[in-house]
Amino acid sequence: MQIYEVTDARFRKYGKVIRNIDFSALTEAMKKTPVPSDVVYEPSIAELEALPVAKEIEKVFYGELPIQIGYCNGHNVLLNAVEYHRSSEINLAATDAVLILGSEADVTDDFTYETSKMEAFRIPAGAAVEVYATTLHYAPCHVDDAGFQVAVILPKGTNYPLDEAHAGGEDALLTAKNKWLIGHAEGGLPEGSHIEIGRAHV
């Protein structure tokens, strides 16, 4: 799979580089977070949310909606699933990382997806990008053996456990609050996750 830069014109349909917020303090704080041998996602970290930039993100980017700042860290070279939200997500790279992205418009009527349509983009350390709500994504991939550290910023409550059962049509894809998931049969995901047609590898 060819890897493009987030500054490439191809990235524009998936998101954009954020240039009007100073993320330097958050980048430094992220460097202190753990990098496991697999992948770990934490939706909300109090120490990150206590940084002054959190209020700026709420005001400037999310229109005064409350947010959560967590991280996705570790080592990964596979795409085992794709997910999307009803809101944009900010990814801030504390290390170089690769995002594998696709378009929700390419999900079929039976809620499957062909991963050969996805494209990979390198996000350099210190850069932050908006990932549009209509962009399919999942855990980043590392670019070297040191692994990756990526801050994940979303509206508060996203990716937390559901309060009710969901089934039928797109509703069946809802696996957590504000999280619709299409999974791969070999991806180690919960039974019942919808199955994608292909599988990507970087």
Predicted regions and their residues:
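Aromatic-residue-lined binding/catalytic grooves and analogous aromatic/hydrophobic interfacial grooves
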Residues: 131
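Active-site region of the double-stranded beta-helix
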Residues: 1-125, 136-199
